[in-house]
From Swiss-Prot:
Signal sequence bounds: 1-31
Coiled-coil spans in chain: 57-89
Origin organism lineage: Bacteria, Bacillati, Bacillota, Bacilli, Bacillales
Protein name: Uncharacterized protein YfkI
Keywords assigned by UniProt, alphabetized: Coiled coil, Signal
Gene: yfkI
Length: 106
């Protein structure tokens, strides 16, 4: 149990040190500041208008569902193509073998 805590402590210390070092880079600092301001603005916007948050979440969930359906259809299509390929491959191999035998006899 103590080793797990030491490892966890080391992970957090490493992350904190990495964050501190990355903030020495001026463009990174500026980008973090801009993101922080954007986040604060969105938070205050959603706090004052919870219906907007609800609508945004619903929209994002609908987009995710649509994407999942599209991916599912594409995976089904690929699986169907693989099945057809598995069916036709032995026939093609047999045809190639027959052609090879025919021309090797001559």
């Amino acid at each position: 149990m103590n080793n797990e805590r030491l490892m966890l402590k080391g992970i957090f210390l490493g992350a904190a040190a990495g964050a501190a070092l990355s903030l020495l880079h001026k463009p990174t600092r500026q980008a973090c500041g801009m993101r922080w301001l954007t986040c604060k603005h969105k938070l205050s916007l959603y706090k004052s208008n919870p219906e907007l948050l609800k609508n945004t979440v619903i929209t994002k969930v609908d987009e995710a569902k649509k994407l999942a359906r599209t991916l599912s259809k594409e995976v089904d299509f690929v699986n169907q193509q693989v099945k057809e390929l598995k069916k036709t491959t032995p026939q093609v191999m047999e045809l190639v073998q027959e052609t090879k035998e025919h021309f090797s006899k001559k």
